[in-house]
Amino acid sequence: MPVRFKGLSEYQRNFLWKKSYLSESCNSSVGRKYPWAGLRSDQLGITKEPSFISKRRVPYHDPQISKSLEWNGAISESNVVASPEPEAPETPKSQEAEQKDVTQERVHSLEASRVPKRTRSHSADSRAEGASDVENNEGVTNHTPVNENVELEHSTKVLSENVDNGLDRLLRKKAGLTVVPSYNALRNSEYQRQFVWKTSKETAPAFSANQVFHNKSQFVPPFKGNSIIHETEYKRNFKGLSPVKEPKLRNDLRENRNLETVSPEKKSNKIDDPLKLEAEMELKDLHQPKKKLAPWKHQRLGKVNSEYRAKFLSPAQYLYKAGAWTRVKGNMPNQGSLNAMWYAEVKELREKAEFYRKRVQGTHFSRDHLNQILSDSNCCWDVSSTTSSEGTISSNIRALDLAGDPTSHKTLQKCPSTEPEEKGNIVEEQPQKNTTEKLGVSAPTIPVRRRLAWDTENTSEDVQKQPREKEEEDDDEEEGDRKTGKQAVRGEQEKLDVHEKSKADKMKEGSDSSVSSEKGGRLPTPKLRELGGIQRTHHDLTTPAVGGAVLVSPSKMKPPAPEQRKRMTSQDCLETSKNDFTKKESHAVSLLTSPAAGIKTVDPLPLREDSEDNIPKFAEATLPVSKIPEYPTNPPGQSPSPPHVPSYWYPSRRIQGSLRDPEFQHNVRKARMNNLRLPQHEAFNDEDEDRLSEISARSAASSLRAFQTLARAKKRKENFWGIT
């Protein structure tokens, strides 16, 4: 048989839900929002009872259920509203029957008001504990009709010590006044013991009278004021910082300094006697002088001079001048409006942006050469004198020409294609004095020139043989093979003259080197260039004493028309066969090899699309055509080669010095795999191109890397602390 009733647990007995002052005030707010609550259905206009939502068992009751529709004017709405507090029996066993009847009628009234049914305990423990507590019987008195007051008074006679308190509370509730609930401290929960409503809400006498008036009316529900306390327990118990006070004037502080602090009791007493209060106010006005109202513009509106306001002023207090905003302490008459200053700043920024844009778009060169062009050391490579025959040669080519003094290159003599290398040392032993005398220029003032130790020509021949070369070219066209023999004989005689002149160059070279060694250390590069000094090793290029290794961009001017060169008979056979081959592979091989210094290069990051015509045609300078045959160096004194044999350029043996130490002879008896030789007059079109072809690709690449390293170091040093 299932258990139909279960007693209250220990938790439910010890921790009962007590009706708090806050919950009661919340319930009263419902009545304030809905004034028609509690009226009869006929007063509300309802003519039929509501239908049930679902079929369920409805307990049968006596016809006394109609009492729920009766309205008792003396009972307030708060008496009808039930509390969810479970009632424990607190009366003795002798009065249990009477309480049963009261509870039964109370349940009937609760069903109409849709209030949940309260549980009731029949356990002995709850009876024993609740026998001494009559205060908890308030929940019953809240909902009992007026005709049940007799039974309630009869039950309170048993405990006479609580009669007066109970009657007073009952009368206050019947009148509709708020009653402070009283609880048993032993039954309160831990939360209720710690957080108790310290003070009850004091109701004004006028409000109490208004409540009584509304309670006596039959149809009008009582008016409930806003009894909800909008202050939480946290705000009441844990006070924060005091609110920031508004700034006051000194006059106000002086006037309020003598004001006495009045307690709430005294203040209430003064309010009760308005006549006495008015008299005191009149006396105070007579004694105190009238306060002068200062103009509104001179009053401070509570502005606090904070750190933010001191540091971050409005833009109107700044002046834009010289690209920066400066604070203006005083009013300047010609400062101008704020919009004008903003406009000046925006205009300046836009001008800078346009300048940067034009600076990038207006310069179309390889970015690898930027540091070379802007180098301050370019002045060290200027030509000291332009009185020589090479005055038309650009300074860029002179600076980049690493040949130096042609007499110094003993191992760089050109090998003929048919005979061994017998003329090498003889050419170097020729004096140079005749050359300088013919030109009429002193040796120290001669700029850097291209003197080919391996060539059959000298600089004197370039000046003196120019008309003869043109005449001989015309003779070749007219007479053909008949003139070929004469040219060979004449070339052989000129070759012997060159050998004699080169001996003097060698002697001068030794004197120059001895002078530099006596002074201690190597002479600066510009000084060596003026003296016609030698380039001993690659260190002379990469680590000069003065100026640094400077690589500049090619000249922007159009080079002069190509000179007519003398065509050798042995070159005619090579001209047609290898000319097409060079043009086909010029573009492909130039991209694989490192570019020589001074030769035009393709921009890796072009600003505009480069056409095929812009691709440098000087790439042929670095193009080899055939491998270099290795020839042993011959001792001096051997017979020179025939004059009709053509000379070729050997880029693999470009940087050689007079020092015979093997440490400095890096390229002796070495031949690069892709070093092919070109006819000298066929590979280039003008003087600059001719001289550019004689610049070593290997030395140019090494010097370029060295200069790039130097440029990066300088840039890192300059930008270490940021660009100012």
From Swiss-Prot:
GO terms for biological process: negative regulation of centriole replication; retina development in camera-type eye. Keywords: Coiled coil, Cytoplasm, Cytoskeleton, Microtubule, Nucleus, Phosphoprotein, Repeat. Residues 93-111, 480-511 have a biased composition (Basic and acidic residues). InterPro entries: MDM1. A motif (ST]-E-Y-X(3)-F motif 2) lies at residues 189-195. A motif (ST]-E-Y-X(3)-F motif 4) lies at residues 306-312. Pfam families: MDM1. GO terms for molecular function: microtubule binding. Residues 138-147 have a biased composition (Polar residues). Residues 632-645 have a biased composition (Pro residues). It is found in: Nucleus; Cytoplasm, Cytoskeleton, Microtubule organizing center, Centrosome; Cytoplasm, Cytoskeleton, Microtubule organizing center, Centrosome, Centriole. The modification Phosphoserine is found at S83, S123, S126, S242, S263, S314, S570, S594, S658. A motif (ST]-E-Y-X(3)-F motif 3) lies at residues 232-238. A motif (ST]-E-Y-X(3)-F motif 1) lies at residues 9-15. One of its GO terms (cellular component) is microtubule. Residues 340-364 form a coiled coil. Residues 79-152, 401-573, 626-647 are annotated as: Disordered. Belongs to the MDM1 family. Microtubule-binding protein that negatively regulates centriole duplication. Binds to and stabilizes microtubules. This is Nuclear protein MDM1.
